[in-house]
Amino acid sequence: LDGIVGAEGMVIHAALGRAFVAAWDRRAGAAGRLEAGAIWGYDLEAGAAPRNLTPELSFPFHPHGLGLLAQDAGGILMVVNHRPRGDTIEVFTITEAGLKHSGTVSGDLLKSVNDVVPVAPDRFYASLDHGAPKGFQRMLEDYLRLPLSGVVYYDGAQLRPVADGIAYANGINLSPDGGKVYVAATTGRRLHVFDREPFEGGLTPRKEIFLGTGVDNIDVDGAGNLWIAAHPKLLSFVAH
């Protein structure tokens, strides 16, 4: 889509015929120009130019992954935000006019957050793509494909770890019945499948599916099929 720089993730609200795209020019940030990112809305039927739905937020906004809890006339959008003082999950309500910011979740466990999937208006799972701090240790984690990352769960009141031992936890999503959580392990080149406990939110490993490529974002269609983006050249991905 023209006009969108640095797209990190996309979700589609089928009932509204609308796509939401999280974008942030991270290369500009690396060059010292910390420009604000945005959530863009795109009408899949009209095909008009995408529209910035977050032009006047009152806080730094550098989005990464995002997740949708759809309802017929709207729903909830949760977005990973890399604020200068730490990662947060921003919660937006979908309205006829666009998006309304309705809350922020922060906490010490939200470090190196990559993606998020909501399971209720106030509950979510988030993937943490690294366990090591930035610098040499993180470089070793990437190039040695060390399984130091994981998943945290927010129950509406507090965060807690629910999965670990994953090599670069990236995209995360939910099965249509809510019974399984899928996590893409980019440097592990596999998909982790967990059984989900619906009341407490705990995850139990079910299986790992080796895919032989650097898996990234996961989309689940209405029939339960998984559509997974991938980076076949892992060294190029890690260098990026």
Per-range role (PLM):
Residues 13-16, 69-74, 118-121, 176-178, ...:
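Residue-level detector of Asp-centered blade-edge/turn motifs that repeat once per structural unit
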Residues 212-240:
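Loop/turn-rich, solvent-exposed surfaces of beta-rich toroidal or solenoidal domains
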